[in-house]
């Protein structure tokens, strides 16, 4: 049965198109523009590399801990559900969810901090902007242009992942100069759903992994205002449930509560502001997709709790320091010895110093955790994270 979209949903038939005209010579199959965007993401090398990029745990001891790839799939599942209920475009939502983490360097935020420092005199590094740089420049499988030539709506949604942008960095400015994305306005509801779905998945699945790893205490978790009502509901329904099944039920229930809260709040905002069409969404005074005030407050408190108790856990810090060392040494090595770069990266060696620094960071940022260690062993010497 064909979905009846809301009047303010993104419509592939009304897409602003792609930067490069692809013509009609190739067989496209029965796919609309946003479905093709999604498929290009899934078939990209950058997407495949997410399998070996860290979510929380570097060099995890268990095969069940999440990585960027599994996180992206979970974000997409949540995003499609929310989009379906709100009668938005599921295909664009899914594509944005799948692509949102492509710009993460090896070892996650640890690696990002090193790359920011490496480019401090060349415009800095931001993983959100780097996602777009990958998709518009670095990932280049086509014969007539660089990048995946994604739709305007896809690029806009990735650029404004967290809302309007007043001061874009160099990487985002380059994309905007080539294909103006109206950076100071709000993105589509589909992009807003993707961002919220990332928060829901991030909070719950990192909690799941942290509990399973024994790094955070369940009693402290269930005392958090975000989790306490869910815990009470689960314990009332299943008073004898323990262990892994108890954690699984807690996570399942918490995701549902956050999804339902976001649906109620988004409907309330739409009813109040009364947008008719997609251009109205872009000119709204605030995001249309979001949590209630209480959920927003509790979710922020929970993030603070997770940073203190999980992301900066003493067991993780020594590995994080070693990972930082690996990335910083690799950047320094290729800066001093660019001939150690792969041949295709040497062939595209820039003429000026700023672009050379960015070129090296592009290469290192594209590495997986595994490949960064492999290149360190190959080019510098033996080194173990744990």
Swiss-Prot record:
SMART domains documented for this protein: HDc
Classification via Pfam families: HD (PF01966), HD_assoc (PF13286)
BP term (GO), one: dGTP catabolic process
Keyword terms of this UniProt record: Hydrolase
Protein name from the UniProt record: Deoxyguanosinetriphosphate triphosphohydrolase-like protein
CDD domains, alphabetized: HDc
NCBIfam families linked: dGTP_triPase, PRK01286.1-1
Domain HD: 68-203
Residue ranges that the Swiss-Prot or TrEMBL entry lists as coiled coil: none
Protein species of origin: Zymomonas mobilis subsp. mobilis (strain ATCC 31821 / ZM4 / CP4)
Keyword Hydrolase listed: yes
GO MF annotations in UniProt: dGTPase activity
Family listed: Belongs to the dGTPase family. Type 2 subfamily.
């Amino acid at each position: 049965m064909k979905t009846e979209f809301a009047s303010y949903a993104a419509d592939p038939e009304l897409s602003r198109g792609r930067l490069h005209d692809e013509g009609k010579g190739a067989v496209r199959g029965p796919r609309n523009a946003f479905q093709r965007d999604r498929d290009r993401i899934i078939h990209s090398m950058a997407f495949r590399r997410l399998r070996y990029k860290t979510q929380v745990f570097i060099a995890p001891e268990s095969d069940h801990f999440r990585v960027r790839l599994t996180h992206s799939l979970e974000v997409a599942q949540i995003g499609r559900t929310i989009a379906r209920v709100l009668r938005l475009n599921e295909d664009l939502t899914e594509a944005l969810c799948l692509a949102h983490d492509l710009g993460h360097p090896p070892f996650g935020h640890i690696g990002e901090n090193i790359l920011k420092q490496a480019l401090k005199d060349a415009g800095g590094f931001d993983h959100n902007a780097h996602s777009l740089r990958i998709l518009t420049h670095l990932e280049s499988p086509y014969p007539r242009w660089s990048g995946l030539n994604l739709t305007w709506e896809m690029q806009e949604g990735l650029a404004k992942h967290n809302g309007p942008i007043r001061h874009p960095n160099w990487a985002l400015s380059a994309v905007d100069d080539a294909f103006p994305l109206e950076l100071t306005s709000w993105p589509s509801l589909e992009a807003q759903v993707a961002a919220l779905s990332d928060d829901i998945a991030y909070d719950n699945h990192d909690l799941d992994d942290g509990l399973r790893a024994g790094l955070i205490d369940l009693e402290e978790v269930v005392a958090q205002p975000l989790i306490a009502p869910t815990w009470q509901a689960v314990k009332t329904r299943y008073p004898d449930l323990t262990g892994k099944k108890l954690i699984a039920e807690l996570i399942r229930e918490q995701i549902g509560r956050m999804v339902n809260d976001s649906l109620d709040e988004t409907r309330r905002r739409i009813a109040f502001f009364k947008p008719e069409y997609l251009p109205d969404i872009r000119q709204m005074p605030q995001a249309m997709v979001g949590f209630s005030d209480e959920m927003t407050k509790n979710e922020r408190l929970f993030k603070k709790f997770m940073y203190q108790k999980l992301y900066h856990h003493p067991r993780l810090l020594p590995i994080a320091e070693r990972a930082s060392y690996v990335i910083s040494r690799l950047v320094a090595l290729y800066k001093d010895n660019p001939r150690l770069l792969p041949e295709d990266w040497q062939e595209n060696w820039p003429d000026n110093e700023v672009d050379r620094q960015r070129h090296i960071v592009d290469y290192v940022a594209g590495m997986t955790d595994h490949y960064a260690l492999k290149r360190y062993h190959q080019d510098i010497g033996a080194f173990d994270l744990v």
